[in-house]
Amino acid sequence: MVPKKCHKSIHVLFHFILLIGCLSCTASLAQEIDKTQLKLHYESATKQFNTYEQKHRRTTKTKNVNLSYLQWGDNQNKTKVLIWFHGSLSNAYEFAPFALDLVKIGYRIISIDQYNAGKTTLPPFDASFDDLCIDIKSLMDTLQIQHAIIGGFSRGGYLATNFYKLFPTYVAGLILEDGGSVAFNTSYFKLNQRQLEQKLQEVNLPADVEEKYFGFYNDQFAAYKSLYDDSNKSDQFEILSFLKPLDQKWITYRGQQEYYHMRDSLQMSEAIFGNPNVSKYASSIIKIAPFEIFKQVDIPVLILDAISVHDPMPVYAENKILAEKHSNFIKHIAFENVDHNIHFAYPEQFLKVITKFLNEVKLTTD
């Protein structure tokens, strides 16, 4: 299971993380880790990671990339399938803590590594959400899965909604965790000029944080150490899924901000307001119009809405309106005192709610 520390953001990263998703593996800046003990954890983690990867890792050639993913459950199960799309700065391991519990109720779980995440590489061109959805459909076709429950967190929620727009017959139901049910820029357009400028400034990171999470490391162990949470004495093998070699060095999240076009306040502003310099991929999340997409909704949709006084994207009212308008299909559940990441803040409640939803969805073999 992914340790809780993998979602515990330090204060200086708070606004940035919540703005573009969830920094799924952050660690404390304050504590110095005993290097000898940590080396033992690292060696053990490497063995665990390799074993886990061998058991659950799959890769399929699709139109644009070799699409990589983790899988749990019976690989012959083509009827009861949940496919999960992770949030920003995350990867397929995001859903690992819940997979086996859902296998127990008869589901096959597939968690995708999106472009430039985990073990899925970037396509050789400026690929959009549409291109990624085509690759995911290709994966489903290869696996002979005619339709599945599609779920996603934050950015992954928007990708899930986009997939439904493009390939509605492939979707038996949707789970949208704090993303994908309301247009991304909705909360920004509610702000006056001063408030908007202040919110955009929160994207800019201090230099020490920038170096720690988006810099280079001399070797894999140093990169592992940078994300290790000393308050949790486990091996934390999932950290290894975030480490990549680059130019004879090692990185963790380097390059991700630029890929989302959310490197700083200027890039964030360009993305929100549709600057033509923004890539097709980065602009994809802004262009999704959930209210329009769900006008003719005819499948069950579960909206999980994180709300708090510090909510970076307050859209409770919009979610409520959407659910009331399509009450036969859309269920809206709010989780209070959560800024964004429900599955971390309330893992048991999250599992309970989605389990109930999955048990209620009517799946066919057609």
Ranges and model annotations:
Residues A30-T59:
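An N-terminal hydrophobic leader/cap segment in hydrolases
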Residues V338-P347:
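Catalytic histidine-centered segment of alpha/beta-hydrolase-like enzymes
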Residues Q146-K190:
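Conserved hydrolase catalytic core segment
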Residues I175-D219:
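Flexible "cap/lid" loop of the alpha/beta hydrolase fold
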Residues S111-G151:
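Active-site loop/oxyanion-hole signature of alpha/beta-hydrolase fold enzymes
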Residues E211-M313:
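Alpha/beta-hydrolase
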Residues K295-N337:
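Conserved loop-alpha-helix segment in the C-terminal half of the alpha/beta-hydrolase fold
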Residues V65, L70-K119:
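Conserved HGGG/HGGXW glycine-rich cap/lid loop of the alpha/beta-hydrolase fold
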